[in-house]
Amino acid sequence: IKGIQSKGVAACLKHFAANNQEKNRYTVNAIIDERALREIYLKGFEIAIKESNPWSIMMAYNRLNGKYCCQNNYLINDILRKEWNYKGCIISDWGGVNDIVESINNGLNLEMPGYNDDYYKNIEQAVKNNKIKEEILDESVTKVIELILKYKESKKIPYKCNIQEHIDLAEEVAENSAVLLKNDDKLLPGNINQNIAIIGRLAKEPVIQALGSSKVNPN
């Protein structure tokens, strides 16, 4: 975190908290008692925040003790803001907000990704209907602006970017991580006159690479 931010790039600590299994992580309800939560699931975040002060932290998809993390008052306000005195920007995971009004009221600052004009009109309407207090919305906006200003200030930090060096390194990593199969018993090339059964979903929809943040452009 310190290394990244020393170069003017915001570090984002994630996924807060108890996102410790991938199966059903969008909806799973992690039931964790206070001692286990403190000693196992929160300790790493606490150390990182107190020692490195990341500019942002990302809330998890899952629920913790019945409340979605993006609208979990205990996690956001009691732990992050009050107990750990965290001053950075609190953002959602990608599409991780289930109720934007509840999320804003419980301290979420930024929902990812951005949406169309109707989305912002809904927030405006919630303010007009007193479902969101204007001062609470102001607090969220302030945290986002502070993050933007940190980025603007970081642009003054001198840097060098050797694109070709990065390309060469990526190529070297790909070459060194490739697996060469041994053609035992002359299995390949196969007999074109035989039928070969390929079983499973990936036979129809092969996953060459994952989506989202792990997707790369082979060019």
Model regions and ranges:
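Glycoside hydrolase catalytic-domain context in secreted enzymes
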Residues: 1-219
